[in-house]
Amino acid sequence: MKSDQQRWDERFRKEGFSLGKEANSFLRKNIHLLPRGKALDIAAGEGRNAVTMALYGYDVDAVDVSPVGLKKARMLAREMGVRIHPLVADLDTFELEKEQYDLIANFYYLSRKLIPKMKKGLRKGGRIIFETYVVDQRDLRTGGPRHLKYFLKHNELLRLFRGFRILFYREGIFREGGRKKAVASLIAEKI
């Protein structure tokens, strides 16, 4: 059985960028709601979101299990004329220092064990932007993880960020990039 790193390295070795170079649409549409400063991109992959945040003036740490993906992220940053700080780490054991970031971005990666660490790593007044699949995605069969543990239950994302000020939340089936996706999307502020 392949490790997570082997699996993602294999995917990212393919020519081009697996998800393209343009940032996640939820990030692009809502970046104006996010505080400037130090940012962390969780499961950064090939860097499309990290590079976009850097273009908007963020000092970005991009963490991912795949050194191959992060090498492409550095290349993309160079191409776009910005810098990011790639960090190769297993997110199952990744630790964040207390109140280290003004913004933490998490797109299409779900580790419930990481969420308390994300909360700890966010400064007061800092924000989380988070989007990932909900259980309805399995019925759509338009992509996403295979295992149920990688899907949010209905309203679970709201519960996971209880105690934060919810600035934006949506959950449902949306058409993006020519296909339907069942997602939960959240922007929340640490109070």
Feature locations, PLM:
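A short, conserved alpha-helix within the catalytic core of class I
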Residues: 110-122
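Core SAM-dependent methyltransferase catalytic element
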Residues: 172-191
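A short acidic, Gly/Pro-enriched loop at the edge of an enzyme's catalytic core
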Residues: 94-103
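Conserved SAM/SAH-binding beta-strand->alpha-helix loop
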Residues: 66-68
